[in-house]
Structure formats: structure tokens, C-alpha cells
Curated annotation (Swiss-Prot):
One of its GO terms (biological process) is terpenoid biosynthetic process. This is 4-diphosphocytidyl-2-C-methyl-D-erythritol kinase. Belongs to the GHMP kinase family. IspE subfamily. ATP binds at P97, V98, A99, A100, G101, I102, G103, G104, G105, S106, S107. The active site is at K11, D139. Catalyzes the phosphorylation of the position 2 hydroxy group of 4-diphosphocytidyl-2C-methyl-D-erythritol. Keywords: ATP-binding, Isoprene biosynthesis, Kinase, Nucleotide-binding, Transferase. SUPFAM superfamilies: GHMP Kinase, C-terminal domain, Ribosomal protein S5 domain 2-like. InterPro entries: GHMP_kinase_C_dom (IPR013750), GHMP_kinase_C_sf (IPR036554), GHMP_kinase_N_dom (IPR006204), IspE (IPR004424), Ribosomal_Su5_D2-typ_SF (IPR020568), Ribsml_uS5_D2-typ_fold_subgr (IPR014721). HAMAP family: IspE (MF_00061). The lineage of its organism: Bacteria, Pseudomonadati, Pseudomonadota, Alphaproteobacteria, Hyphomicrobiales.
């Protein structure tokens, strides 16, 4: 069989409400409207007898040890759940920043499961595929079918696909990796403690651009404030986005440090990206669309 290829797009939390810490397992309960960007890593699978991984690309270095990569972790979980699973050699081209709040590793893992499912004739809702996604990480299930939807629970509860309009946007990462654990520590919730805040807005099944802004503008990312204490440069990145002509909303994604802004049109997004690159040439800046 020829090489199988898929994209692993950046996952953007348009909203991220933390409801509290669950008393049973201590995980943080959340509600989040998730969309996906045009920018992505690329993953290939060459069918073969063994599971292997090769990583290249501009952000390959920070991706960490090969043997601990989420691509192989997801593949091993699936192999453990499916007798006789056909395997192969993965080739990952890393374009997305690592530890950046955009689910790069989770999206890569989900891409690996998609390719193995394709190779083995498995549906994405096949129980072993879902189980492997959940075992690999909280963000992996929503990345299996990378289209806009709501996440709830600790990330394991995935809502139906939503018809969100494609939004002109800019993603900015100031080059500072931010691990999730210190951000949750800064949030400071004890097990069983609830976080006060307005309820998440109701999200309709189909929304044009103005309706999407109407939903997300009054919402929030509850991890933004604690992340600013961990990496204050996030605030600088947000300020640069808000200062650009045509910016309709700027917010942090996930636990940071990537921030995003929704713009009035693609031209405004392109101009904003150019201005921010000129001001901060060492930052990762990408005009894109979110849907």
C-alpha cells in the first residue's frame, strides 16, 4: 500500500470555562468551544511490520524524545486493543509550536489513530480507537475528527459537529513553552472546589461569523489570568493583537502561551500578522482561518 498522509491541525479553544475540580479524580471539569486552524503538522504512515517514528520540521527539536511522543503512545494503545493491527513507520513534519496551548501533540496523536484506522479499515468511532484516544490524552478525542464542537467533562465528553463559519484569524506564540500543570497550579483550585463565573453561552448548531463572535465575546478562558502569572509575555502578545486594525477579539488558547485574534477579514489578518512579525521577528505568527 502507498504512503498514507493526514494533517494534524492546531486546536484552538475559542472559549474555556473551568467549572471546578472533580471530587473523584481531581481532574478539572471544563466547557470549551473548540475550533481548528488551517495551520497544521503533517503525518505520514508507511505500512510495515513495526511502529517507528521520525520527526522533522522547524519545531522538531522541542518535540521531545521519540519514544515518549504521543504519536507512538496512541499507536501502542490502539495496537494493544486490536489483535493483529497492521502497523508501520510514521513520519511527522512539525510546524506547530510545542507546549503551546493549541493541542499540537494531541492532534498528532489523533492523526496517528486516523491513519492506523484507515490502514486497518476501522471507523473513527470504533470502540478501540476511542479508547486509545482517551488513554493517550484528554485533548486527543476531540482531535480525532477535527471540526468545531463543544468539549465537556475533563475533555472526554465530545459534542456533535457544529456548523461554525470560517473565521479569519491570526495565531501568535511568543516562543515560551508553557506546561499545563503550572497554570492549573496557579489557578489554585482544591479537589472538589467549584469556580464561580457566568455559565457558558448556548452554542447553536450553525453560526455565521457574527453569531460566533456573539457567543465567544461574553465567554472567557479561565486559564488566561493564571497563565499570565506563569508567562507574562502572553499579555504582551495579546496587547499586540488588540492593537491591530480589524481585530474583533483576542484571547489565549488552552493553557497558553499561544494567543489568537479574530479579524474582520483575511486582508486585515494578513496585515496584522505582518506587523507583529516585524515587531517580534522571533515569535511564531500565522494568519489562518478557524472553523
Amino acid at each position: 500500500m502507498s504512503v498514507l498522509t493526514t494533517r494534524a491541525p492546531a486546536k484552538i479553544n475559542l472559549t474555556l470555562h473551568i467549572l471546578g475540580r472533580r471530587p473523584g479524580d481531581g481532574y478539572h471539569a471544563l466547557e470549551s468551544l473548540v475550533a481548528f486552524a488551517d495551520v497544521a503538522d503533517t503525518l505520514e504512515l508507511v505500512p510495515g511490520p513495526d511502529l517507528t517514528l521520525d520527526i522533522s520540521g522547524p519545531t522538531a527539536g522541542p518535540a521531545g524524545p521519540l519514544d515518549d511522543n504521543l504519536v507512538l503512545r496512541a499507536a501502542r494503545h490502539l495496537a494493544a486493543g486490536v489483535d493483529g493491527l497492521r502497523l508501520g513507520a510514521f513520519r511527522l513534519h512539525k510546524q506547530l509550536p510545542v507546549a503551546a496551548g493549541i493541542g499540537g501533540g494531541s492532534s498528532d496523536a489523533a492523526a496517528a489513530l486516523r491513519l492506523l484506522a484507515e490502514l486497518n479499515g476501522l471507523a473513527l468511532d470504533y470502540p478501540a480507537v476511542i479508547a486509545a484516544a482517551r488513554a493517550t490524552g484528554a485533548d486527543v478525542p476531540v482531535c480525532l475528527d477535527p471540526r468545531a464542537r463543544m468539549m465537556r467533562g475533563a475533555g472526554e465528553e465530545i459534542g456533535p459537529v457544529l456548523g461554525l463559519a470560517s473565521l479569519p484569524a491570526v495565531l501568535v506564540n511568543p516562543g515560551v513553552p508553557v506546561s499545563t500543570a503550572p497554570v492549573f497550579k496557579a489557578l489554585g483550585l482544591a479537589v472538589g472546589q467549584q469556580l464561580d463565573g457566568a455559565e457558558h453561552p448556548v452554542v447553536g448548531a450553525s453560526l455565521d461569523a457574527d453569531a460566533v463572535l456573539g457567543v465567544i465575546a461574553p465567554a472567557r478562558n479561565d486559564l488566561e489570568a493564571p497563565a499570565l502569572t506563569v508567562a507574562p509575555v502572553i499579555g504582551e502578545a495579546l496587547g499586540l493583537l488588540w492593537a491591530q486594525a480589524g481585530c474583533r477579539l483576542a484571547r489565549m488558547s488552552g493553557s497558553g502561551a499561544t494567543v489568537f485574534a479574530i479579524f474582520s477579514d483575511d486582508g486585515a489578518a494578513e496585515m496584522a500578522a505582518g506587523a507583529i512579525r516585524a515587531a517580534q521577528p522571533g515569535w511564531w505568527v500565522e494568519p489562518t482561518r478557524l472553523a
